[in-house]
Structures are given as C-alpha cells and as structure tokens.
Amino acid sequence: MTAQSVILPLPSDHARFIVLRLKDLSISELKQQIEALLSTRDRLITQHPNDQIKTAIAFGPELWSKLYSQTPEDFRQLDPQHGAFDMPVVPADVFIHIASARADICFAISQAFFNGIQSKVDVLDERACFRFFDGRDMTGFIDGTENPQFPDDRAEAALLTETAGAFADGSFIFAQRYIHNLAKWQQLKVDAQEQDRKSVV
C-alpha cells in the first residue's frame, strides 16, 4: 500500500472535505466515481504542476468490509465520548480530502466525483476550507503546533508500520469538526483568551 498524496505533506492553502453515506449508489458506481475523481486530479496535476494538488479517500468500516476481504487490525467504528466536551460519532461510508493551492481546483475535483450521483448519496458534511493567515484557527491562535513538522516524523505519526502487513503505509482517518462561538470569544480580553486556550489544549 502507498501513502495517499495528502497524508504527509504540510497543509495547502485550500482544501475540501466531503463525508457521505451511500444511499442508492452501487459499489460499481462508487468505483467509477472514484476513478473519475482520480483521473480529474491527475489531469489537473499535469495542467497545473505547481498547485500542490493532493487527495485522500477513506472508507468507513461497514463499507470497507464490502470492498475488501481483509481488514486492518483495530479498524472499527469509534464510540461517542462524553465529558467536559461531547464528541458524537456520525457513521459514514466515504471520506474525501482534496487539497490544493487553489480553491477552484478543489471544487473541480469534487465535482468530478459528484457528477451524476447527487441523488444517490447522502452528503453528511461538505466543507470548503482555507488557510487563515499563517495557519491560525478561527480564534486567531496558531493551531497544530504539536503536529510533526518533518517528513520522517509525520510518516511515523500518520502511517501504519510494517507490522500492518499489506496495510503498511496506509492510515486511519479521524475526522473532527469544532464550532467556535466567535461572538462570545471576541468579547474576551487577550489574556483571558490565552488562558482559555490553555485550558482546552
């Protein structure tokens, strides 16, 4: 298995995340749409070689079992977490991550996948994302400072090892989305914001 192109590089300026369930889409149709996405990506890479075009496609445990006869160890649906912050779980079949230096390229690749199948899938979430200044989150703080910065360190953190056998260099994806109350946040003084960030991190 080869690491998918979006897994190891540093983030691009734009990205698109798609989470969906199959409704009336057959497995063969899904494979056709994935091929359309990948062929569009490859064509755009040829046309725009400097625009950092990268993708990853992941499958949920239920769909995986229909696609493949073997399953990576510990690959399962997560359980909801409850505590200071609730972390619900929304089971999905397909997760698509598209990244590029350009938003229009991300959109074009996503449309190649959706072409003709919109009524056959349930889109649970679709997000067009952008780099905010120098990699800050929406609260204005630099996020992800604990993430590995060097290629070897990122590979160690993100890829399955040789002990995974045929799945070595594959990855598990945990997709999370946070909602910020920016109106309330902006009423806080800077020192209070900094303290609040420390309590969360």
Predicted regions and their residues:
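Long, histidine/aromatic-enriched segments associated with O2/redox biology
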Residues: 1-201
